Amino acid sequence: MSIRDGCSARFIFVTGGVVSSLGKGLAAASIGALLQARGFRVRLRKLDPYLNVDPGTMSPAQHGEVFVTDDGGETDLDLGNYERFTGVNTTKEDNITAGRIYQQLLAKERRGDYLGHTVQVIPHVTDLIISFILSNDDGADFIICEIGGTVGDIESQPFLESIRQVSYRLSKNFTIFVHLTLVPCVGSAGELKTKPTQHSVKELSSLGIQPDIILYRSAEPLPQYQSAKIANFCNVSADNVIPALDVESMYKLPVMYHAHKLDTQILSHFGMGAPEPDLTKWANVLTMVNNARNVVTIAIIGKYTKFLDAYTSLTEALDHAGMHSGIKIQVKWVDSRLPVRESDLHDVDGVLIPGGFGDDGVDGKVLAIGYARANGIPMLGICMGMQLAAIEFALNVAKLEDANSTEFNQACKNPIVVELPWLQKGEGEYLLGGSMRLGSCTYRLSADSRVASVYGSTVINERCRHRYCINPQYKNVLEEHGLSFTGMSDSHGLVEVLELQSHPWFIGVQFHPEFKSSPFAPHPLFTSFVQNVLQIKQRGFMHKSVSAAAILVPGSSVVS
């Protein structure tokens, strides 16, 4: 673990108490950004206590989005925040779950690696967790480890025991514990209660971990006497009781935490000095957020509209593009599982169809695509959104009867979308998890295409996550009717990009551009989309004369 100046990496462990979803991931990302702004090299990791091997097969309604890394990892959404805040690419080795730990453990036991010993949680499970924490520091000065779940959860105990052991082995000079809790506001008088924080710290201390810094989540800072109360009863320095206040934009968090000296206290704990952080780029982002003057409404048509964590990277990518273009993005969420009505779409300036799986809500997405295509509304389709754009075009323009995807109907007459050739089911067990095309891929764009103009290049790299693709047998017939396939994969010859050149702005991509957008470098595809949404709105190019009722969806009869 040697790094600059011959020192060892310092470890920052971020835990959470009272309730989940308090913002541990954003706190960890903010700490990373602040230390980075002081000239240090950081690496961030997430340890999840659930028994799934990875989040790839988990419902977004329960877990939120699956963030895909360059090397093909299906990881927790917090890794997306780590990348957006620090600009440091994460890998599949930066996210571990209890399921993956037990998978490794049982494989070792079957091989006989434990030489007849009784395999137990301690030391065998904890040793594997510790090995993950200490591995692959890549020359980082600080490794920030977020522990998923809440103190008190049974499944979290092996992870908490592991970080306790790391602290014991490396000494306090190389580890620090940051604990995030909730200070709820109770009653009509708005009284802030510190007792849940005290109980959470008591629970953590009973496991052998004494937090060094307490971040309390609250709508407003505590009065000095209540902050002192937390310090006294939680055995923490008063300077280390730091507010984690509600903010309008997550990109205000590093500035806010620095104002409350979080990074200063961390460095003080380690006895380290450093220059003041250069937060200019963060100040610039906040200025852009506050200075957006133009407003556009973009409809996102999806089936997880009540669980917005399912679309975290997507909405952030829209915001990045908007803030750099002086445009405020208003998202109109449309649940595709419900009947999508014309009234859901008539007042929007752009339509975005995100990725997804399964036939639930497909008809609503196809109807929205057709309405956007027919009425000149800018449309961006991602992953399944691109596949459905091809199906909608086949049904309503090429007039191909029963055009569909074999994902939804294996017996359809015109399978526009089919399973990837190398994934098609053969004999033996079919594994759903970890069996998709994943990670960074190289794509070649047609030189005269709109998308090549957007990227400023004919060769791009993007991250993908899919099991189905456009059927190459239908490429010619769809092109004959006006649909252009302007991007192909470099290695497999798959259709990766489509566009409708007769339309003001209509692009579908098989990959996930949202995973590579940041507040400091918005993704060019989202920037082009958002800017064209505004321009087309201002110029009045959208006519909206074609009724949604005229759009055929999969399973409809084709009218010649």
Swiss-Prot record:
Q: Name one GO biological process term.
A: 'de novo' CTP biosynthetic process
Q: Which residues bind CTP?
A: S20, D153, I154, E155, K193, T194, K195, P196, T197, Q198, K229
Please list the residues that bind UTP.
S20, K193, T194, K195, P196, T197, Q198, K229
Pathway(s) this gene product operates in, as recorded in its UniProt entry: Pyrimidine metabolism; CTP biosynthesis via de novo pathway; CTP from UDP: step 2/2
Which named protein is this? CTP synthase
Q: Which PANTHER family match?
A: CTP SYNTHASE, CTP SYNTHASE-RELATED
Name the domain of life. Bacteria
**What is the protein's quaternary organization?**
Homotetramer.
Gene name tied to this protein: pyrG
Region entry Amidoligase domain: which residue ranges?
Answer: 1-272
Cross-referenced Pfam families: CTP_synth_N, GATase
Is ATP-binding given among the entry's keywords?
yes
Any single GO CC term annotated in Swiss-Prot or TrEMBL for this entry: cytosol
Family assignment?
Belongs to the CTP synthase family.
Q: Which reaction(s) does its UniProt entry say it catalyses?
A: UTP + L-glutamine + ATP + H2O = CTP + L-glutamate + ADP + phosphate + 2 H(+); L-glutamine + H2O = L-glutamate + NH4(+); UTP + NH4(+) + ATP = CTP + ADP + phosphate + 2 H(+)
Q: Which residues form the active site?
A: C383, H512, E514
Q: Where does Mg(2+) bind?
A: D78, E146
Which NCBIfam families does the record cross-reference, listed alphabetically? PRK05380.1 (NF003792), PyrG (TIGR00337)
The residues listed in the UniProt record as binding L-glutamine, with positions renumbered to this chain, are G356, M384, G385, M386, Q387, E407, R467
Per the UniProt entry, what species is this protein from, by scientific name? Anaplasma marginale (strain St. Maries)
